[in-house]
Design a protein with these regions (language model features):
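SDR active-site strand-loop-helix element
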Residues: 34, 59, 84-90, 127-133, ...
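Short-chain dehydrogenase/reductase
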Residues: 105, 109, 157-169, 199-207, ...
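Adenosine-cofactor binding site in Rossmann-like domains, unifying the SAM/SAH pocket
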Residues: 49-74
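C-terminal substrate-binding subdomain of Rossmann-fold SDR/epimerase-dehydratase oxidoreductases
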Residues: 20-21, 28, 35, 39, ...
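Conserved Rossmann-fold NAD(P)-dependent oxidoreductase catalytic core, especially the SDR/UDP-sugar
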Residues: 113-159, 184, 197
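NAD(P)H-binding glycine-rich loop region in Rossmannoid oxidoreductase-like domains
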Residues: 69-109, 118-121, 133, 138
Length: 388
């Protein structure tokens, strides 16, 4: 068992803690963004660069396996970052969470253990951990305040992932309380944006909707060239554009995509909140640069807990409404159907963003503009990858 008490620059007397560690990062600070190629990590990277923080470090999964403790230690030994943004995680939609429960809890716990542990041992000044609002109970009072954490049962479909993320935020909280570290956890709502995951096997709700409706539109219009370009870029169950029309139709039909209709999971009734990923990045960088752990709880609290920060819009709409907006944006003339035999997930998920607002950040991009931006980004990506 590791004895942390004799390691790391966070071990300070009470009087030293905030004076020594709670300092603003300057533009020469070396910042490691774990997961810098992902949806949020890439947006955080770009946001930092745009603010003049250019001493950034990133590694692809091929270059650095965050599940490997030896490799992670070697990376920290060599790079000695001043700050860390932990945006790397094993993520997926309802189907993936149901089918690969062990992967979701094991891999996320291992990533967090390795990165947070080495950050402590190497005296990292500031760490920002990205979680998810799935940490809250299935029937949490709405909108969900940070204080709702661990008050009742979690949603079954993503329970392993949620437990891993709860462990991550509690690691940040506990290291900060015991050792005086400056580790903060932020819990974003449903995110979407550039570099999103559009693979039908494991994508989240909004990118999955956009791709399904787009492919159905192409089939409806008989545009097989567009269909083949799409699945050449992102094959579905190994099926790409070289296959026959019949094989492609059979495979897409498994995911509710036909020329006549798009069929989505559930009833469409659950209420959800969506935040543009570049705004999540802006909120994250705002917290990284301007908020310290001591700002996340009330002075004088005897029991300090729930120090994480919700990040969202504070606005919600039903999955059905989102789907209808996607259909309208893309211009699909077929039917939109719902398979009520499939799970809906949590009935309602809306964050209370009062703490975030009090810390000085508000969102700007609304859902209609976001859907338009994401669809344009998706189409542009297909075109770029098929230039002759």
């Amino acid at each position: 068992m590791t004895d942390y008490s004799s390691q790391g620059a966070c071990v300070l007397t009470t009087g030293q803690r905030y004076n020594n560690l709670y300092k603003m990062l300057d533009k020469n600070s070396k910042i490691y963004v774990a997961g810098h190629n992902g949806l949020v990590g890439s947006a955080i990277w770009n946001n930092l660069m745009g603010r003049g923080y250019t001493n950034l470090v990133g590694r692809s999964h091929k270059e650095l396996d965050l599940l490997d403790p030896v490799a992670v230690k070697k990376f920290f030994d060599e790079e000695q970052p001043d700050a860390v943004v932990l945006a790397a995680a094993h993520v997926g939609g309802i189907m993936a969470n149901l089918n690969y429960r062990a992967d979701f809890i094991y891999q996320n716990l291992q990533i967090q253990q390795n990165v947070i542990g080495e950050s402590y041992r190497h005296g990292v000044k500031k760490l920002l951990f990205l979680g998810s609002t799935c940490i809250y109970p299935r029937m949490a009072p709405q909108p969900m305040k940070e204080e709702a954490l661990l008050t009742s049962e979690l949603e079954y479909t993503n329970e392993p992932y949620a437990i891993a993320k709860i462990a991550g935020l509690k690691m940040c909280e506990s290291f900060s309380l015991q050792y005086g570290c400056n580790y903060i956890a932020v819990m974003p709502t449903n995110l979407y944006g550039p570099n999103d995951n559009f693979h039908l096997e494991n994508s989240h709700v909004l990118p999955a909707m956009i791709r399904k409706v787009y492919l159905a539109k192409c089939l409806n219009e008989g545009d097989w060239d567009a269909v083949r370009k799409d699945i050449n870029l992102r094959p579905v169950e190994g099926v790409d554009g070289s296959r026959s029309n019949e094989e492609i139709l059979t495979t897409l039909a498994k995911y509710g995509i036909t020329p006549e209709a798009v069929t989505l999971w559930g009833t469409g009734k659950p209420m959800r909140e969506f935040l543009w990923s570049e705004e999540m990045a802006d909120a994250s960088v705002h917290v990284l640069l301007n908020v310290d752990f001591k700002d996340t709880y009330k002075p004088g609290d005897k029991e300090i807990r729930n120090c994480h920060i919700n990040v969202g819009t504070g606005k919600e709409l039903s999955i059905r409404e989102v789907a209808e907006k996607v259909v309208a944006e893309i211009g699909f003339r077929g039917e939109l159907r719902w398979d009520a035999s499939k799970p809906d997930g949590t009935p309602r998920k809306l964050t209370d963003v009062t703490k975030l607002h009090n810390l000085g950040w508000h969102h700007k991009i609304e859902i209609d503009e976001g859907i338009h931006r994401l669809y344009e980004w998706y189409k542009k990506g297909i075109c770029i990858n098929h230039k002759s």
